[in-house]
Amino acid sequence: MNAVAQAATPDVNEVPAPLVFTDSAADKVKQLIEEEGNPELKLRVFVQGGGCSGFQYGFTFDEDTNEDDTTMTKNGVTLLIDSMSYQYLVGAEIDYKEDINGAQFVIKNPNASTTCGCGSSFSV
């Protein structure tokens, strides 16, 4: 039996999805926007320096979309990410969890090499 050496080819399934915005997160944001009474609001997710691990996530509502923003719409909710933050969030999942510890938005980020105990700070 002859073995033929083949060059390793990258598996296209290993390429991370640009970003996952779960139904749970989109539905919670939709509820919060309705409570604010301003249908023009969009959720802006960003990364900034700080926290115990070097970077931290931030969430805010914004009416404006900037030229360099990446936008994603799910369940009628628009998510905005600026170009600097996007590079740190490629492949991440933005979710909303409710459990005995409380309710919070959670980012599962494959780019983070370490995260702190609070889950809002990370390093790459």
UniProtKB/Swiss-Prot annotation:
GO terms for biological process: iron-sulfur cluster assembly. Binds 1 iron-sulfur cluster per subunit. Iron-sulfur cluster binds at C52, C116, C118. Its cofactor is iron-sulfur cluster. It comes from the Bacteria. SUPFAM superfamilies: HesB-like domain. Keywords: Iron, Iron-sulfur, Metal-binding. Pfam families: Fe-S_biosyn. The keyword Iron-sulfur applies. One of its GO terms (molecular function) is 2 iron, 2 sulfur cluster binding. InterPro entries: FeS_biogenesis, FeS_cluster_insertion, FeS_cluster_insertion_CS, FeS_cluster_insertion_RrpA, HesB-like_dom_sf. Belongs to the HesB/IscA family. Homodimer. Required for insertion of 4Fe-4S clusters. HAMAP family: Fe_S_insert_ErpA. This is Putative iron-sulfur cluster insertion protein ErpA.
